[in-house]
Curated annotation (Swiss-Prot):
<comment type="similarity">
    <text>In the N-terminal section; belongs to the AAA ATPase family.</text>
</comment>
<keyword id="KW-0067">ATP-binding</keyword>
<keyword id="KW-0862">Zinc</keyword>
<dbReference type="InterPro" id="IPR037219">
    <property type="entry name" value="Peptidase_M41-like"/>
</dbReference>
<dbReference type="Pfam" id="PF17862">
    <property type="entry name" value="AAA_lid_3"/>
</dbReference>
<keyword id="KW-0793">Thylakoid</keyword>
<dbReference type="GO" id="GO:0006508">
    <property type="term" value="P:proteolysis"/>
</dbReference>
<keyword id="KW-0479">Metal-binding</keyword>
<keyword id="KW-0482">Metalloprotease</keyword>
<feature type="transmembrane region" description="Helical">
    <location>
        <begin position="169"/>
        <end position="189"/>
    </location>
</feature>
<feature type="binding site">
    <location>
        <position position="563"/>
    </location>
    <ligand>
        <name>Zn(2+)</name>
    </ligand>
</feature>
<dbReference type="GO" id="GO:0009535">
    <property type="term" value="C:chloroplast thylakoid membrane"/>
</dbReference>
<keyword id="KW-0812">Transmembrane</keyword>
<keyword id="KW-0150">Chloroplast</keyword>
<keyword id="KW-0645">Protease</keyword>
<dbReference type="GO" id="GO:0004176">
    <property type="term" value="F:ATP-dependent peptidase activity"/>
</dbReference>
<dbReference type="InterPro" id="IPR011546">
    <property type="entry name" value="Pept_M41_FtsH_extracell"/>
</dbReference>
């Protein structure tokens, strides 16, 4: 194959490459245009078309270069060219050792050294064959001893230099470089932005917002599906009315709120409210998580924030929902070593977009978080989040309404009362109640029932609060100790004024607890008196007191570990937070110590002296000591009733609150806690 072929291969595709002259011909203005038209600057549209045409020509040129390189690699000579005669004359190969043997026997006539002396084409006079053979031998370099021996044997040998085909070498180089060059130039062209180089067109689309956009949202959820959060629901209905009939409010000079921040514990329905307003408002809806702003590349977060609000302004009026905004809206300057600059840059961009120099007319931002205490103060000010709606745990009426929503598609037994379930589930969030009804339905199906009964609902409550039911204990000393422990809790709590009534005592293990004593909690856990707190400590120590009095101090067990931790925490809060001790009404705890943020806790200043710390420990010890003496007194004075209750509990393994009080009333004339005027949350159970 001749070099002419490679030259033609090189020139063929280059003839199709668009040149600058063609480009200028395509964009020549017609002669009929007036002279004044030539003096005008080209429009923005013309500049963009010219920019796109230039990129297209450059891409075509790069593609042609790549195809030319690949075709040249196929058609051209190899970069190395050896003498044709020795190589083409032989296809046989011989080992180096056999070559040396033939050399010693004076059978080697001629040696041609090629490829820098690493290969030899050898002519051997083989008496066995009776003719001269031409073979190829791979040499381990070119040893001096081999050259000396060939001279001694008068062997005709010659070294052939390597001829370099520079045309083929160039085509080979371009062939290897062509594809990476095409890929690189294509990425640069597609990722470049004429107006905003660091804007939404970052490589691989990193700068574009990941928000889900719905022009006509269809979430399947309306305000009828939201219950138990009437105050928050009313605020959202007002925003929807503002979007649908803005003239009603603008006539009075009112402006639509720019932002609404939803705060509250997890599972209370913050995201559900956002889905409801998306289905009711009838305006474009953008939704994303706060964590979707930040990536591993610097500048991506701020770019995505700009892109999000640019799209929102283009579709205004609209709603932007940012879930878990604490992922990006955390207070600035709290990070170790100066903080997370990328997150702070993103937050600064969000602050500017929400209420900066340009403003964001027509864009309503709704955000949700369960950690409002760590949000930046600039994010919370009016003008950005005009309204802060607290979505708390529902009360008994709210729980009943939520249960009605989640029981629409479920078959309930006629004996099931949603109001009773609502009364027995204080402290449950909307998500907890939805999970409760789903667990009850699963349990009823597992048991082969066609309806959900109160038994399945009770078992589901136990499972959600305390965990799955474990293997029942075998009768023996351990089971008796657990029975006395749980009855001790119930006795001490019932006989102490201010405690909550017993709901259930059981020996059925759940989770890590081998036995459980349930109390019927109250509706307002935020207002608790000193007498109630002391009664809780007495009830919590009732299990340890029963073990101590009945079995003796050497037989007390580790089952009271959780109880001791709980009562110690209550006693310390009475001293340091609530001012219910001899020290006086002091708040002795730095609020920053209670923060969930690790950095804030590290930076918290402890202003407490050593003497004051000793006084606090003494007061805590005295409160717990007094409560323990009261608990042991209850156990000693009601030993007969305790033995009876333990016998019944070992037999039935579960006692309801009414059964427990009926047996206890036979042995004592002391008033029992049977009403639920003052109660605690159901999660504040006492377990072993």
């Amino acid at each position: 194959m001749k070099m002419a072929s490679s030259s033609s291969a090189l020139s063929f595709p280059l003839s199709n490459i668009p040149t600058c002259s063609k480009k200028s011909q395509q964009f020549q203005k017609p002669a009929s245009l007036s002279k004044s038209s030539h003096t005008h600057k080209p429009s923005l549209k013309t500049q963009i078309l010219h920019h796109k045409f230039t990129k297209r020509n450059l891409l075509s040129l790069t593609t042609a270069l790549g195809f030319t390189s690949a075709l040249g690699t196929v058609l051209a000579h190899p970069a190395k060219a050896e003498p044709e005669a020795p190589i083409e004359a032989t296809s046989n190969r011989m080992s180096y050792s056999r070559f040396l043997q033939h050399l010693k026997e004076n059978e080697v006539k001629k040696v041609d050294l090629i490829e820098n002396g690493t290969v030899a084409i050898v002519e051997i006079s083989n008496p066995v064959v009776g003719k001269i053979q031409r073979v190829r031998v791979n040499l381990p370099g070119l040893p001096v001893d081999l050259v000396r021996e060939m001279k001694e044997k008068n062997v005709d040998f010659a070294a052939h230099p390597m001829n370099v085909n520079w045309g083929a070498f160039l085509l080979n180089f371009l062939g290897n470089l062509g594809f990476p060059l095409i890929l690189l130039v294509s990425l640069l062209l597609t990722s470049s932005s004429r107006r905003n180089p660091a804007g939404p067109n970052l490589p691989f689309g990193l700068g574009r917002s990941k928000a889900k956009f719905q022009m006509e949202p269809n979430t399947g959820i309306t305000f009828e599906d939201v219950a138990g959060v009437d105050e928050a629901k009313q605020d959202f209905e007002e925003i929807v009315e503002f979007l649908k009939t803005p003239e009603k409010f603008s006539a009075l000079g009112a402006k639509i709120p720019k932002g609404v921040l939803l705060t509250g514990p997890p599972g209370t329905g913050k995201t559900l409210l956002a889905k409801a307003i998306a289905g009711e408002a009838g305006v474009p809806f953008f939704s994303l998580s706060g964590s979707e702003f930040i990536e591993m590349f610097v500048g991506v977060g701020a770019s995505r924030a700009r892109d999000l609000f640019n799209k929102a302004k283009a579709n205004s009026p609209c709603i932007v929902f940012i879930d878990e905004i604490d992922a990006v809206g955390r207070m600035r300057g709290t990070g170790i070593g100066g903080g997370n600059d990328e997150r702070e840059q993103t937050l600064n961009q969000i602050l500017t977009e929400m209420d900066g120099f340009a403003g964001n007319t027509g864009v309503i931002v709704i955000a949700a978080t369960n950690r409002p205490e760590i949000l930046d103060s600039a994010l919370l000010r009016p003008g950005r989040f005009d309204r802060q709606v607290s979505v708390g745990l529902p009360d008994i009426r709210g729980r009943e309404e939520i249960l009605k929503v989640h029981s629409r598609s479920k078959k309930l037994d006629k004996d099931v009362s949603l109001s009773v379930i609502a009364m027995r589930t204080p402290g449950f969030s909307g998500a907890d109640l939805a999970n409760l009804m789903n667990e009850a339905a699963i349990l009823a199906g597992r048991r082969g029932k066609d309806k959900i009964t109160l038994t399945e609902i009770d078992d589901s409550i136990d499972r959600i609060v305390a965990g799955m039911e474990g293997t029942k204990m075998i009768d023996g000393k351990s089971k008796a100790i657990v029975a006395y422990h749980e009855v001790g809790h119930a006795i001490c709590a019932t006989l102490t004024e201010g405690h909550d009534p017993v709901q259930k005592v059981t020996l059925v293990p759940r989770g890590q607890a081998r036995g459980l004593t349930w109390f019927l909690p109250g509706e307002d856990p935020t207002l608790v008196s000193k007498q109630q707190l002391f009664a809780r400590i007495v009830g919590g120590l009732g299990g340890r007191a029963a073990e101590d009095v009945i079995f003796g101090e050497p037989e007390i067990t580790t089952g009271a570990a959780g109880d001791l931790q709980q009562v110690t925490e209550i006693a310390r809060q009475m001293v340091t937070m609530f001012g219910m001790s001899e020290i006086g009404p002091w708040a002795l705890t730095d609020p920053a110590v209670k923060q969930n943020d690790v950095v804030l806790r590290m930076l918290a200043r402890n202003s407490m002296s050593e003497k004051l710390a000793e006084d606090i420990d003494s007061c805590v010890k005295k409160i717990i000591g007094d409560a323990y003496e009261v608990a042991k007194k209850h156990v000693r004075n009601n030993r007969e009733a305790i033995d009876k209750l333990v016998d019944v509990l070992l037999e039935k393994e579960t006692l309801t609150g009414d059964e427990f009080r009926a047996i206890l009333s036979e042995y004592t004339d002391q008033p029992l806690n049977t009403d639920g005027d003052v109660r605690i949350r159901i999660n504040d159970l006492i377990s072993v």
